[in-house]
Amino acid sequence: MESGALVEEFGRRRFLARAAGVAGAVGVKALTGTAAAATGAASDAASAAGYVDVQLLHITDLHGYLSAPPARDSLITGAGGRTYAVGGVAYMATHLARLRAGRANSFFFAPGDLFSGWEYPAFTLADEPTIEALNRLGLDFATAGNHEFDRTPGFLRRHMEEGVPYDGAGLTNAFPDSSGAPFHGADFRYYSANAVSAASGETVLPPYNIEWVDAPGGRRLPIGFIHLTVVGTEGFGNSFQPGLTTLDQLAAANLCAARLKALGVGAIVLSMHDGAVAGSDFDSGSEPSGPAYELALRVSADIDAIVTGHWHCAFNMMLPGPDGRPRPFVEAGCHGQLIGEVTLRLDADTGTVVRALTSSVNHPNTRDVDPDPVLAEVVTHWAGYAQRRGAGVIGRQRASFHRRLSPAGESTMGNLVADWALWAARQAPDSFDTSPRPARSGADLALIAVSPRMGRSVINTDLLAGPALDDPVGFDRAWRAVGYGCPLVSAEVSGRRLLEALEQQWALDGSGVLTYAPLAVSDNVRYSFDAAGPVGGRVAPGAVVIDGVPLRPETSYRVVTTSYTLTGQDGYPALGDYREPARHRRDTDSFPAYVAALGTLEAVSTGRVTVKPVPLLDPPGSTGLLVTPPEPVPGLPSPVAAEEEAARDAGRRPVC
């Protein structure tokens, strides 16, 4: 049976009940990996005689970095502390051609997060530059990572895979590629065994694929590839998807492995978008830890190799499975740093992997080779196209908008952004978004964290007018001013919880100093707070007015804010008690669309927040010490990259 029939036979059946019933837990203890060859014979070319040679090439977490990775990732360290300058798809194409030469059975794949990244052309052009580059690199298939769901599952299937134009609020569509042809989608497919519809329990993508290799006598042997998405994707800030659920990885992998074996597949590879850390040498491994490592020790012994991603780490090692037999456990860094290579030898009669002859290596994607001219042209084309499009005028402005906060915590930029959020929640949903919609659409009010205690504000810069009466606003300026690639989300929140969220603007820091992390409100909201009141007792229910009506604690209000704020990642936990969430468009798509829809940005209303009693404003500290909005990190291409950089500097592993 050929691959299409096998995949169709399994299809997108319900996974919830079946995955839950798969036993997978076995007793294991922490281990340190051995060398990246199962035996001494594994790396000997002569050992391939009589066996079917299979080459598995892989990259991960490219994140749209086509020209080069950010500076912090442009050097990697190998054995003996040697460093290599790496990155760029034009150089990758040259290395891939060298590695593929003479290998009849070669596959090139990735464990996810290839697009929805942070290099400017990919970020602003609906990730089409990345897909064209991957098509020209010859990618065969890929696992869906969390960032593949940064828009919607429908966007991944309809636009990325099928090439159907994406409306993007009128500002994101199918752009001409480097040949001048319109975007036609990926020449490869995406897979995930554990990303399912929350409503139906069916996988939103095929769970596995089966490829075929040539064997002696004109026969063909199958190899199965199982794909896993990181658990929790549906709740991450960028990929917040109320209509999606990610199932237990171990159960899903074991279920697929059993199914593939029952179908007669003798060689199985696991490609998972979840990771681990295992030392600093990109081509070895020591003291591994992390969720992928824990899974690797326990997952089905029928799986012959485990290729990981998500953690932006690099390692190459052999780990024993639950039966004690070694198998490759590898990750190829991020942003085009490395090309991983796993070599399998299949028994020509049975199609099973001869584990003793398995080997793996991570190759640095060095920049000391001639760049491939076709890929170099792809990079040049998209960089120029993005620059020209960014300079295009999408609106005008007659007022300046500042992030500078008043003693009451207001700013003109904050008020503008709150008005945008309310507008965005009242627009038609993404045409590719098929997730269930709540009974009540739109939103009653917007809250925007202009200076949160945790994380970063959605506001990146001031939006200043020049001396002209109607100053032009270019796409690039609007795009950079607001957003970090996350969706706005609306949800039902009780008036009581809304009051609690407003109270949570004030908190005592570790030194006992009262701090104030203000929330901007949309123009239909007015409220006042008592600067002399205690923490937790500064905002009275009657002091909050929405559309001219005093707030009622028992009433449900539909609030729109950023996904980070709603899920408690900005320091307002009361908002986390929400119901019926609905995802709206990504901020970096939606704010430029708002500017274009308005045509002209006029001055926004102020005085939405007032302080009583007024005399207590002297001294100013009576309102609390305002949390200073952080400045974007200089030299980084986007707010998302700035957030990742800040997370790394703070010693936290970012959700990548």
Task: Give the location of each predicted region.
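N-terminal zymogen propeptides
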Residues: 2-9, 17, 23, 645, ...
